[in-house]
């Protein structure tokens, strides 16, 4: 009897072992090279998806950048160099695009460079008014007011300065300049790496602009490189904005630019 039970037990053990082998299921953890291979097999599809997405984004960015360069070609000069296709350009007004301001009420260095370039355009007689356009949506943060104060400190008459408090991005500034301030012709002042996109946007929404780009940001190699790279992605948004023709914050019509131009013409006689 004991011998028969022993044979039965052995048979059950063999059957169980065979059953586990037939099922192909192992309860032992995957270790060593097998674990690495298993992880790779899981990650491989994810990596392929990421590469595909990055490729699509790169193609879109390249196409959008080519659009910006094409539309802006022949309409950009570098401030202070006296060269470039738009070197002899004049306009009734210079539009200065906003940028970061500090908590102490001072413009960031790059914004100060833009304002310096605009002040030079005014004092040299190439424009008759300056429109500063920026963001003031957050409490305690007011780009246009800081920009105006800086120009006043540079000796620009307050009567020659107009203010756009709803220039939340470049597209908004361009559309509002045309539809709210009634500007038809302008010089657009920003950093040189930003000019192709900015000029392309403005010209695409019906505003006749030439860009005056400040190149002093190039001395900050890291910042300039990061911003130049960012421009490639921002060009995609620019194309979407132009194609969709979205309406920015508009509000009532403004006459401040026309009044500033008229004041300067009267006092330059």
Q: How would you name each of these model-derived features?
A:
Residues 245-269:
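Short linear elements at protein peripheries
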Residues 24-25, 36, 233:
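Intrinsic disorder/low-complexity detector
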Residues 31-84:
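N-terminal type II signal-anchor transmembrane helix
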């Amino acid at each position: 009897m004991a011998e028969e039970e022993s044979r039965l037990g052995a048979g059950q053990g063999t059957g169980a072992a065979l059953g586990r082998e037939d099922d192909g299921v192992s309860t032992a953890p995957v270790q060593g090279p097998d674990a690495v291979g298993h992880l790779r097999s899981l990650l491989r599809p994810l990596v392929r998806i990421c590469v595909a997405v990055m490729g699509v984004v790169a193609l879109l960015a390249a196409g959008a950048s080519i659009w910006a360069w094409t539309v802006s070609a022949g309409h950009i000069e570098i401030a202070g160099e006296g060269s470039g296709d738009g070197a002899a350009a004049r306009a009734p007004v210079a539009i200065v695009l906003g940028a970061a301001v500090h908590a102490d009420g001072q413009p960031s260095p790059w914004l100060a460079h833009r304002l310096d370039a605009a002040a030079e355009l005014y004092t040299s007689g190439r424009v008759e008014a300056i429109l500063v356009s920026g963001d003031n949506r957050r409490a305690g943060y007011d780009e246009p007011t800081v920009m105006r104060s800086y120009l006043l400190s540079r000796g620009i008459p307050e009567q020659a300065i107009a203010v756009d408090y709803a220039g939340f991005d470049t597209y908004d500034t361009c559309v509002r300049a045309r539809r709210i301030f009634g500007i038809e012709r302008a010089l657009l002042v920003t950093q040189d790496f930003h000019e192709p996109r900015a000029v392309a946007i403005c010209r695409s929404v019906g505003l006749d602009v030439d860009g005056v780009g400040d190149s002093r940001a190039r001395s900050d190699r890291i910042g300039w490189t990061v911003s130049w790279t960012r421009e490639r992605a921002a060009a995609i948004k620019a194309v979407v904005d132009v194609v969709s023709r979205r309406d920015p914050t508009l509000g009532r019509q403004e006459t401040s630019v026309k009044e500033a131009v008229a004041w300067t013409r009267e006092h330059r006689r």
